[in-house]
Curated annotation (Swiss-Prot):
Organism domain of life: Eukaryota
The encoding gene: e(y)2
Protein name per UniProt: Enhancer of yellow 2 transcription factor
Transmembrane segments: none
Annotated keywords: Activator, Chromatin regulator, Cytoplasm, mRNA transport, Nucleus, Protein transport, Transcription, Transcription regulation, Translocation, Transport
Amino acid sequence: MTVSNTVDQYTVLSGDRSKIKDLLCNRLTECGWRDEVRLLCRTILLEKGTGNSFTVEQLITEVTPKARTLVPDAVKKELLMKIRTILTENESEIEDAEEP
């Protein structure tokens, strides 16, 4: 199991995943990322979606890499710090529980 999978599993089990997702959604909205991605989708659809042959899957495949690069570094850092805090708190709780 990778570190990423372990963190993902822990956050799901502890209930912190929804808090992290809420924080991410709020920050992406606040910084205008969602609007940028919406415009990117609209632009791609206008360029390639003249017929009905352009599928949602194709749009997602094209938009995802560009959208990921648009996420501000400050948002990435904040989420990373939040995850580290959650894991550190968990580690402290485990150590406290193990002490006699």
